[in-house]
């Protein structure tokens, strides 16, 4: 048995053991996903965003570039851009950010932006006024098919997640997203992170709202 196979087996055993204790939770700060048209408008035709750091989800990354978002009441600077480029531009903030900006953003799943408020985006040289795309991301779990089978959950199922931190609580209305392209993590925003006393590496226990089939 070679070292690579041994390492792979150890990683799989560790993953399964951790899954028994729930899913790891990550807190996501405000960020934007840009489409090709918006990148061109903000940074120039054909501009390529600069990869800075990988995220936990395979193929997703933080870009070096930053922008500002402008609402009726205030401006938030140094907003992170996530890559790669999306089909439609989307801005994800917390409810607290929305209050500061003076815009009430609805709670939506990623990609569900029809009828949402717009917002002004500013780069160092240019601006883009979005007609829609501002949301508060619905809390969710990215999950691999193998982990979903182990947890006995299905695509788009709504579950509860119990967080045993310094301020233990149960998050309701958590949507499960399943794909072989995912890594298994729950994502909450900073408002939710503050509510549960979030610390890096904290885990959540999935509570099914319906009986497993």
Curated annotation (Swiss-Prot):
Pathway(s) where this gene product acts: Polyol metabolism; 1,2-propanediol degradation
GO biological process assignments: propanediol catabolic process
Location(s), subcellular: Bacterial microcompartment
Sites where the protein binds phosphate: 86
Free-text cofactor note: There are 2 Zn(2+) ions per monomer; Zn(2+) and CoA bind inbetween the 2 domains in each monomer.
Listed EC numbers: 2.3.1.222
InterPro entries in alphabetical order: PTAC
Residues annotated for Zn(2+) 2 binding in this entry: 140, 142, 187
Catalyzed reactions: propanoyl-CoA + phosphate = propanoyl phosphate + CoA
Keyword NAD: no
Family: Belongs to the PduL family.
Domain notes: Formed by 2 beta-barrels, each is capped on both ends by short alpha-helices.
NCBIfam families: BMC_EutD_Gpos, PRK15070.1
Protein name: Phosphate propanoyltransferase
Originating organism: Listeria monocytogenes serovar 1/2a (strain ATCC BAA-679 / EGD-e)
Taxonomic path: Bacteria, Bacillati, Bacillota, Bacilli, Bacillales
């Amino acid at each position: 048995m070679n070292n690579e196979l041994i390492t792979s087996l150890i990683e799989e055993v560790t993953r399964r053991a951790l899954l028994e204790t729930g899913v790891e939770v990550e807190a996501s700060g405000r960020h934007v996903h840009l489409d090709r048209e918006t990148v061109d408008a903000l940074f120039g035709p054909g501009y390529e965003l600069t990869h800075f750091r990988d995220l936990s989800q395979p193929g997703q990354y933080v870009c070096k570039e930053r922008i500002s978002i402008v609402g009726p009441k205030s401006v938030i600077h140094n907003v992170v851009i996530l890559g790669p480029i999306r089909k439609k531009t989307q801005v994800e903030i917390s409810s607290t950010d929305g209050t500061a900006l003076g815009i009430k953003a609805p709670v939506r799943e990623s990609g569900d932006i029809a009828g949402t408020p717009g917002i002004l985006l500013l780069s160092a040289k240019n601006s883009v006024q979005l007609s829609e795309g501002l949301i508060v991301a619905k809390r969710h779990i990215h999950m691999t098919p193998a982990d979903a089978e182990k947890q006995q959950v299905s695509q788009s199922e709504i579950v509860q997640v119990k967080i045993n931190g310094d301020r233990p609580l149960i998050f309701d209305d958590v949507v499960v997203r399943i794909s072989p392209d995912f890594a298994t993590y729950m994502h909450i925003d900073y408002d939710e992170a503050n509510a549960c006393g979030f610390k890096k590496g904290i885990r959540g226990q999935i509570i099914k709202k319906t009986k497993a089939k």
